């Protein structure tokens, strides 16, 4: 049996508890609907994350292959000099957006792909293999930033799902059962009190009639 609430067994408390149960059940339904919607959104984004991860792994494989080719064709030292001469890439701005009531990151950045002349090593190395390797790693960077945003969104949605689940379970298995058990107890207690009053009045009536007869 569920634990009872510490309230007085009165009709006022009975009415109050019935109202609270109605509100709790409405709240439970809203939270359950929210939980279901969050789970659907989570798996939609999860599928996107899997696709991005596959694409990233493929592009990283290609990028390292082109880097190895550039090292063979241009030489280790010229490649290192080109890497040291590369200008910093564009800045990334992290904002916030709302997904199902959850604040998640929104990474705003223009594409990382640049022309060879914009990378800073144009006069250091003219090998086309270095340019190809740089281009492939810029593609990797584009995907990595997008994947980071999606994976962080998944983490936050997962936390919100867990929080919502705990609230749903608390209402379903603890709060509502306790209130319903208390309502049942108050009804029983009020019935007992009503019977006690009935028999008390009956005895009083009998005493009055007995005295009147004597």
From Swiss-Prot:
Entry's localization field: Cell membrane
GO cellular component, one term: plasma membrane
Coiled coil regions in record: none
Keywords: ATP synthesis, Cell membrane, Hydrogen ion transport, Ion transport, Membrane, Transport
GO terms of biological process kind: proton motive force-driven plasma membrane ATP synthesis
GO molecular function list: ATP binding; proton-transporting ATP synthase activity, rotational mechanism; proton-transporting ATPase activity, rotational mechanism
Pfam families for this protein: ATP-synt_D
Location, primary (coarse class): membrane
Membrane association type: Peripheral membrane protein
Membrane listed as a keyword: yes
Family listed: Belongs to the V-ATPase D subunit family.
Known role: Component of the A-type ATP synthase that produces ATP from ADP in the presence of a proton gradient across the membrane.
Record note on quaternary structure: Has multiple subunits with at least A(3), B(3), C, D, E, F, H, I and proteolipid K(x).
Identification of the protein by name: A-type ATP synthase subunit D
Annotated source species: Thermococcus gammatolerans (strain DSM 15229 / JCM 11827 / EJ3)
């Amino acid at each position: 049996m569920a634990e009872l609430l510490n309230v007085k067994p009165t009709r006022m408390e009975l009415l109050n508890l019935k109202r609270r149960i109605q509100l709790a059940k409405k709240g439970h339904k809203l939270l359950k609907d929210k939980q279901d919607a969050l789970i659907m959104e989570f798996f939609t984004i999860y599928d996107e994350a899997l696709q991005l991860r596959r694409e990233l792994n493929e592009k990283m494989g290609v990028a390292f292959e082109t880097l190895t080719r550039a090292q063979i064709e241009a030489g280790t030292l010229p490649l290192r000099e080109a890497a040291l001469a590369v200008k910093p890439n564009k800045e990334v701005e992290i904002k916030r957006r709302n997904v199902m009531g959850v604040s998640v990151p929104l990474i705003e950045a223009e594409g990382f792909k640049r022309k060879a002349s914009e990378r800073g090593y144009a006069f250091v190395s003219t090998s086309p293999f270095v340019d190809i390797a740089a281009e492939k790693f810029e593609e990797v960077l584009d995907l990595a930033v997008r994947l980071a945003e999606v994976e962080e969104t998944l983490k936050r949605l997962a936390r919100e799902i867990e929080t919502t689940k705990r609230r749903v379970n608390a209402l379903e298995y603890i709060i509502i059962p306790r209130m319903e058990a208390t309502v049942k107890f108050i009804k029983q207690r009020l019935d007992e009190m009503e019977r006690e009053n009935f028999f008390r009045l009956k005895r009083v009536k009998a005493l009055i009639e007995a005295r009147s007869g004597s």
